[in-house]
Structure formats: structure tokens, C-alpha cells
A protein has these predicted regions:
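Acidic catalytic loop of the alpha/beta-hydrolase fold
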Residues: 165-169, 194
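Flexible "cap/lid" loop of the alpha/beta hydrolase fold
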Residues: 76-115
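Short alpha-helix in the alpha/beta-hydrolase fold that links the catalytic acid
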Residues: 156, 170-179
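Catalytic histidine-centered segment of alpha/beta-hydrolase-like enzymes
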Residues: 192-205
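Short beta-strand/loop motif that positions the catalytic acidic residue
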Residues: 153-154, 160-162, 166
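Hydrophobic, aromatic-rich cap/lid helix
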Residues: 120-149
Length: 226
């Protein structure tokens, strides 16, 4: 099996930690970066500070950045780094329509209904570890941020992935996110909901490998002008 050309770095979703990607990492060598609100019960700084913390963990590169759910927002903000060779966004959740609590609750319940029940204890223990305070703070920091503006400045391949049963990342929103990236591509996984990193690890691993091969090994982009 071909491995990615370069290091894979994963950023988990809201309240989640490395356990959310354990099944994926059995199939794909990858490193997980935990951040406040995403596995760490720490005060959540501004989104650009979170992105800077992620960039400090990238090493020499090239790197394939993979974000899940709210982690997509941090990945999009960090992806202008010249060490990033490709980006995979699993279920980005900053659809402006979800700033309404009623819409968010309705979509969350609809998505939960489409998830396998075996995930519930695993997700609950991760949320407990991260804590509601950090999770709320991350949502407030990330949800107003314009991911389309971020991705417009990302020249590397960007693969947007959603499950066909994911109401937190509906089809029209995923299309909009994909269109914002100069080299964006949308992939929908049939029957999956929001937790594709956990429920469909084979599909996600294949997409990460494909994204990594779409950028030549060792490519370095020049640093951006200040």
C-alpha cells in the first residue's frame, strides 16, 4: 500500500482528541496535534493563534494537513504555510446558517441520528476530557470565521469530504467551501454522517493518500510576502 508523500498531521474536531482518529491511524501513519477546545481543556485563544500553534508543529515538511469538523477552520488558517503540500477537510462546520442555536441544534440532532451508536461512549469521554468551557470557547472563536476567505489564499490541493448523511456539513455548504479553494475538490462518502474519520477510516485514508500524491514529494512553496 502506498503511503503519503510527506507527513500527515491531523487536527481533531470540537471536543475530540486523538482517540477520534485511532481507526484511521491504524491504516495511515499520522500525527495528531491537540489544541485548546480540541482535546485540551485550556483557554481558547483567537483562531490565528491556534493556527500559529499548529504551524509550530509542522516540522520540515512537506505536510498533508487533515482537519475534522471545527478542526477544519484551524487547518484552513494554517494552510498558507509553505510546508503544506495538500489539505483534507472532513466535514467543515462553519456554515453561517448554524450561528443560530435552533438551526445548530436541529442539524446536530439530525446528524446524530445518522451516526452508528457504538460511537457514543467514545465521543462522550473525549468531550468530558476537553470540557464544555473550552468547547464553547472554540465554537465562539471558529464559527464566525470565513473559511472561504481563508481557502482563497491556499494554492495547494484542497479536498473537502462530507458524508451524505451529514447535516452539520450539508451538500450546498460543502460545495461553497470547495469552490473557494483554487484547487478544491469535493468528495461525498455514501451513507456516512459527520464522524467519517472514525466510521469510514478506509475511505478517508485513501483520500489522504490521493491528496498527498497530487503534490510532488518535497515541493516547497516560497514564503508569502508580508
Amino acid at each position: 500500500m502506498n503511503e503519503p508523500s510527506g507527513r500527515v498531521v491531523l487536527v481533531p474536531g470540537l471536543g475530540l482528541d486523538a482517540r477520534s482518529s485511532a481507526r484511521l491511524r491504524e491504516r495511515l501513519p499520522a500525527d495528531v496535534v491537540l489544541l485548546p477546545g480540541m482535546g485540551l481543556a485550556q483557554p481558547v485563544p483567537a483562531l490565528d493563534v491556534l493556527a500559529a500553534r499548529l504551524r509550530s508543529d509542522l516540522g520540515d515538511g512537506p505536510v498533508v494537513l487533515v482537519g475534522h469538523s471545527q478542526g477544519c477552520q484551524v487547518v484552513a488558517a494554517a494552510a498558507v504555510d509553505p510546508r503544506v503540500a495538500a489539505v483534507v477537510l472532513l466535514g467543515p462546520t462553519t456554515d453561517p446558517r448554524m450561528r443560530s442555536a435552533a438551526v445548530l441544534a436541529r442539524r446536530w440532532l439530525g446528524t446524530v441520528a445518522g451516526e452508528p451508536s457504538w460511537q457514543a461512549p467514545l465521543v462522550a469521554v473525549q468531550w468530558w476530557r476537553t470540557g464544555p468551557r473550552a468547547m464553547r470557547a472554540l465554537w465562539r472563536a471558529a464559527s464566525p470565521d470565513r473559511i472561504d476567505h481563508r481557502l482563497a489564499r491556499v494554492p495547494v490541493p484542497v479536498v473537502v469530504v462530507r458524508g451524505t448523511r451529514d447535516r452539520l456539513c450539508p451538500h450546498d455548504w460543502a460545495v461553497q467551501v470547495c469552490a473557494a479553494a483554487p484547487r478544491g475538490r469535493l468528495v461525498e462518502i455514501p451513507g456516512a454522517a459527520h464522524m467519517t474519520v472514525q466510521t469510514h477510516p478506509d475511505d478517508v485514508a485513501a483520500l489522504v493518500r490521493e491528496a498527498s500524491r497530487s503534490s510532488p514529494r518535497g515541493v516547497r512553496r516560497p514564503p508569502e510576502s508580508p
